[in-house]
Regions:
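4′-phosphopantetheine-dependent carrier domains
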Residues: 1-184, 189-193, 210-473, 477, ...
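C-terminal catalytic ATP-binding subdomain
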Residues: 196-197
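Disordered, acidic interdomain junction associated with two-component signaling
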Residues: 200-209, 223-227, 485-489
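Short loop/beta submotifs within extracellular cysteine-rich repeat domains
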Residues: 262, 479-484, 488
């Protein structure tokens, strides 16, 4: 084969084909095609609004949870929490900082004085806002993950700002411009503001094209294929190696990448279910040695012993970290202990692996992270924080010239590892958010594509862009991070989708109710609530939602309760407490509460209220008869009066008789008359 100049670029003696499954073909197409599922994060510069960017006159500084009560005395509109780590990224420091931030956020969210205010959480150097720049504060990155979950649970209340690590000024000068952008996530570098956006990851072919333009095409062909190669003579360490994802990766490395020496680490080692069968299977696939060992990867001494146990004959050349645990809970339910539990196999483990392998000749250092740390996942604050830290470690390694990539995965199919616990309600919530499950074969295709790339952070996530576009077109909210993928959806707006009046403002709902009787108002609000309940629970319609069925009996938990509260708040504009589902425990009780809030004076309309009729009569009486004649209504009015059973025929009428007849009509008659209904 030759290039465009006629120079030979390839000599081939033979070519061997092998069968490729349809799943793998689909995975390859998904990774590199126009509808691919591999993304990266780009920081897009924001225009500074001309209006509203003035310096903020006053705010209250919150350093700890105890400051919330003291700061509430003046009922300020704005509170600022500065959360700076020491830059070491030590696991203890990460836990201490995120626990402090958690305490402040929890106290602020429940403080009545701050109910209508905003909280700005400020970090410094926690985000790589200038591309693949270094992250100087990994602990601050964990704070971003935690607070993103808090934002998902409490829309429009919290803002995250990352200050320039090269600067020393506090947050004060930038509060006005940042808040004026309306962005929930922002970074300040010099005088520029930017916000994160998901963009499609560059395919390997794009890298090669750029290299060819620079006359280094031949070098790129070697570089892109070998930079991530798992050397057959080296050992690959896979943490979480007997779990669903670790097993999937181990099979893939041996079968597709030619790895011959594999070290699988898990909490139970060979005692884990299926571990011995996995060893035999990997041997059949071509592995020469497979070691399965139990190790607490959160323990530095244990990790040091593990790394030191690898033979010099087959040195450690690759690390793939898939280990992790879940302990989901809304922000208000989290504790420092629950943070620590999830941080162990994520924050501590990756920190130890990073430190203890820096002097080794690794070709791959890949960590399985989660998109929850980027997009924000309600009910997963601790998990999001841990994974955001992993992303920061990958950035630090790349900045130091070391291999490192964090893969912030979206939703795996239910049978895979950490998503196996998801029920129908959870899956329905993900689907409404435009996130689809990734099949195992497709996931491994994305894994390979991530390794071929040059980004420190990639996001393998299967997005339903058609649904996201429809949501954007309908004015429904999209997180700013994914809004850039959809035309017209770059900014997050408050709105909801669903049934029974979803998406209307509080004023629109009040206007609909104002024309109804009290009984009709309650019926409309009941259907309104039942419709939103049906959406949250994943029902096709509201038929399965009983008016007096307790929310807890219908399957509500703390997370679905928060989601329902947010949907109702977005649709009504009301300030609803996070406990509203517990305070009003069934759809009927909640509908009656909304009735009192939307129509506080109990104003109704209909036959029992004649204030509107009186106003209409006065208006009709003020109209000259010529107006009715010109509109062609006079004859109809006369005929209507002549057919009234309560009045004798009036024969010929003069103007005075006409006015009297019209004045005797009720509202229903007048409406029918105006519509031409005789």
């Amino acid at each position: 084969a030759a290039d465009e100049t006629g120079e030979p670029v390839l000599t081939m003696d033979s070519l061997v084909f092998r069968e490729v499954s349809a799943d793998r073909l689909g995975a390859a197409a998904g990774a590199g095609g126009d509808d691919g599922s591999l993304f990266r994060v780009e920081w897009a510069e924001l225009p500074v609004p001309a209006v509203g960017s003035e310096p903020v006159a006053s705010w209250v500084a919150l350093a700890g949870a105890e400051d919330v009560a003291a700061g509430a005395v003046d009922a300020p509109d704005l509170a600022v929490l500065e959360a700076y780590g020491d830059g070491t990224g030590d696991g203890d420091e990460v836990l201490a900082l995120t626990a402090r931030v958690l305490g402040v956020v929890q106290a602020w969210l429940v403080a009545p004085a701050f109910e209508n205010g905003k909280l700005v959480v400020v970090t410094r150097g926690a985000m790589p806002a200038t591309g693949d720049a270094d992250v100087t504060d990994p602990a601050g990155a964990a704070v971003w993950g935690l607070v993103r979950a808090a934002q998902a649970e409490n829309p429009d209340r919290i803002v995250l700002v990352d200050l320039d690590p090269a600067g020393s000024a506090g947050a004060g000068p930038v509060l006005g411009p940042v808040l004026a952008t309306g962005e929930p996530l922002a970074a300040v570098r010099g005088t520029a503001l930017s916000a994160p956006r998901l963009v499609r990851a560059a395919a390997v072919e794009t890298e090669r094209a750029a290299a060819a333009a620079a006359d280094v095409a031949a070098e790129s062909r070697t570089k892109t294929e070998s930079a991530y190669a798992f050397a057959p003579g080296g050992t690959v360490l896979v943490t979480g190696g007997t779990g669903s994802l670790g097993t999937l990766v181990a099979r893939h490395l041996v079968a597709e990448h030619g790895a011959r020496h594999v070290l699988l680490v898990s909490r139970r080692g060979l005692e884990a279910e299926g571990a011995r069968e996995l060893v035999a299977e990997l041997g059949e696939l071509g592995a020469e040695s497979v070691v399965v060992t139990a190790c607490d990867v959160a323990d530095r001494a244990a990790v040091a012993e593990l790394v030191g146990s690898v033979s010099a004959q087959h040195p450690l050349t690759g690390v793939v970290h898939t280990a992790g645990v879940l302990d989901d809970g809304v922000i208000g339910a989290l504790t420092p202990e629950r943070l620590a539990y999830v941080f162990g196999p994520k924050v501590a483990a990756v920190g130890h692996l990073d430190e203890l392998t820096r002097d080794m000749d690794l070709s791959v250092f890949a960590v399985f992270s989660s998109a929850s740390g980027l997009i924000g996942s309600a009910g997963q604050g601790n998990y999001a924080a841990a994974n955001a830290y992993l992303d920061a470690v990958a950035h630090r390694r790349r900045a130091a010239g070391l291999p490192g990539v964090s893969m912030a995965w979206g939703l795996w199919e239910q049978s895979a590892g950490l998503t196996a616990h998801l029920g129908a309600v959870d899956q329905a919530r993900m689907s409404r958010g435009g996130i689809l499950p990734i099949a195992p074969a497709e996931g491994m295709g994305l894994f390979d594509a991530a390794l071929r790339g040059s980004a420190a952070l990639v996001v393998p996530i299967k997005l339903d862009l058609r649904r996201l576009r429809a949501d954007a077109a309908a004015g429904r909210g999209l997180p700013g991070l994914v809004g850039g993928l959809v035309q017209g959806g770059r900014r997050q707006v408050r709105a909801v989708d669903g049934q029974a009046g979803a998406g209307e403002s509080g004023g629109g709902l009040a206007a609909r109710l104002a024309g109804l009787t009290a009984q009709e108002q309650e019926a409309l609000l009941l259907d309104f609530v039942r419709g939103h309940v049906a959406v949250v629970l994943g029902h096709a319609g509201m038929a399965k939602v009983g008016a007096e069925t307790a929310f807890k009996d219908a399957g509500f938990d703390s997370l679905t309760s928060v989601e329902l509260r947010n949907r109702l708040r977005g649709a009504t504009g009301l300030k609803l407490a996070a406990t509203v589902v517990f305070d009003y425990p069934n759809p009927l009780a909640l509908a009656r509460h909304l009735h009192r809030e939307v129509i506080p004076d109990g104003v109704t309309a209909g036959p029992d209220v004649d204030v509107d009729e009186a106003r209409l009569r006065r208006g009709l009486a003020s109209l000259p008869l010529a107006r009715f004649r010109a509109a062609g209504l006079l004859d109809a009015l006369v005929r209507l009066v002549e057919l009234d059973d309560h009045e004798p025929p009036i024969g010929t009428v003069d103007d005075a008789d006409d006015e009297t007849a019209i004045a005797d009509l009720n509202v229903d008659d007048l409406v029918q008359l105006a519509l031409g209904d005789k």
